[in-house]
């Protein structure tokens, strides 16, 4: 048995719920990491590992520490990325896995980096004709040109971390501070 926490012998070849042929059986579920969303990742990663085990996969939780360090168990065939925010969604962990030759869930490091960074993703969406609300990218001290109300978001942050809705001019400085 590759990962004893699953409580089943390894070597299953079909997903016991769907009957789909499995390409990999030994799965490292990466969770944690350095971001402000670490605690959410620990919970969601544990749920992913439990669900994979229930479907007959040999899955193990692999905690990525706050310094981005982790060790994959010997025999890992694929990594399931269950990390959020910095290093999880921005292409960081994906680049490390690629360098180690480990297949992983999700997109390439480059695609993750572009999608995570709103200064890169918004223009790509506009160019592709995907509807997006009016926006502007501001650096510290630059004046806003969009009329209130506005939503202020950090350029490189996941989920709703650092997001504010601004309805009055006096709310603007606090929203900018939160986004940085």
Language model segments and positions:
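Residues in well-ordered alpha-helical elements
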Residues: 39, 119, 133, 170-173
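An N-terminal domain-start capping segment
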Residues: 47, 103, 108-113, 164-180
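Glycine-rich phosphate-binding loop of ATP-grasp-fold ATP-dependent ligases
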Residues: 41, 149-178
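Solvent-exposed alpha-helices and their adjacent loops that cap or buttress functional pockets
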Residues: 21-22, 72, 142-145, 154-158, ...
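Rossmann-like NAD(P)H-binding beta-loop-alpha module
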Residues: 127-158
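ATP-binding N-terminal substructure of ATP-dependent carboxylate-amine bond-forming enzymes
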Residues: 1-7, 11-110, 114-127, 139-143
